[in-house]
């Protein structure tokens, strides 16, 4: 799963 990557992507946007 790429949940971690998804979370990192969202955090990077913020």
Swiss-Prot record:
Keyword tRNA-binding part of the UniProt annotation: no
Major subcellular location class: secreted
Keywords: Amidation, Amphibian defense peptide, Secreted
Localization in the cell: Secreted
Entry superkingdom: Eukaryota
Lipid metabolism found in the keyword field: no
A single cellular component GO annotation: extracellular region
Tissues expressed in: Expressed by the skin glands.
GO BP, sorted A to Z: defense response
Leucine amide carried by residues: 14
Family according to the record: Belongs to the frog skin active peptide (FSAP) family. Brevinin subfamily.
Function comment: Lacks antibacterial activity against Gram-positive or Gram-negative bacteria.
Protein name: Fallaxidin-3.1.1
Organism of provenance: Litoria fallax
